[in-house]
């Protein structure tokens, strides 16, 4: 009759089947058989020992298979298709978390570029039907309220005018910052260099200068020259040991440089705003003159088209001598235009 040790051994084998063919189990069996022979009892022969098969780690095979898939293949795999796709929730093995994040961020950057602008355009055409399915209704409601706000619409129009209009003849104002705001770029620069305050002039150089060293627009080039000239002027009149604004190397501190940059930038923005206001005043005056004197408005309009037509400076102006009455009207129009723009009257009649 089997002893209690045999029962314990069988239970242990059921719990841990990997140790069936272990040397310890074999020793126990032989020990039991030996004791049965000595006691005179007959012990049934043990079943043939199965051949030990090499263990296969299916976990590693699964990980290798997933690592060889692209993001699209991973999301379209049969394992993922079994989940509820309407919930937009995906699962993957923890061992590929880093790769999934890299793939996700790359896809996000390509898909989300100008995405909000496209949403707004679709909303203007289709209304709330343009809402993407995955956007929270409260978030979409907030976007619609922002798009309908007159202040945000005015800000959008001003930004569009600033991008596509050349008010001072120095080319359209551009930048190379992309979708990254200047504030975020300044924060990243501080994290990279360890500075507490970023150098605004270096940020301007980073976001407005091409790889060949040239600026992308004339306005940025002018501001950069004015700021650097002012900094050199201040540094040439200071002593590094006596002036607290200087650094140990004899130059201005970052705070002082940023102060100069802010002053020059504020002056440039004020100049642009003043030009915009003058242009607006001229438009109002022109509308008033067009209503009161259509003939004078036609003369002004003809003069503007003539100036635009003479785009080539090498071509001599071809115009007939104006009659005295027409000349007087043109002189009056020029005086009114100078009054609106705040400039001095020209010496010759246009």
From Swiss-Prot:
What single Pfam family name could you report for this chain, choosing any that match? Transposase_24
Organism source for this protein?
Answer: Arabidopsis thaliana (Mouse-ear cress)
Query: Which family is this protein grouped under?
Result: Belongs to the transposase 24 family.
Protein name, as recorded: Probable transposase-like protein At4g04430
List all Low complexity biased stretches: 30-43
What domain of life?
Eukaryota
Instruction: Tell me the segments the record calls region Disordered.
Output: 1-57, 307-328
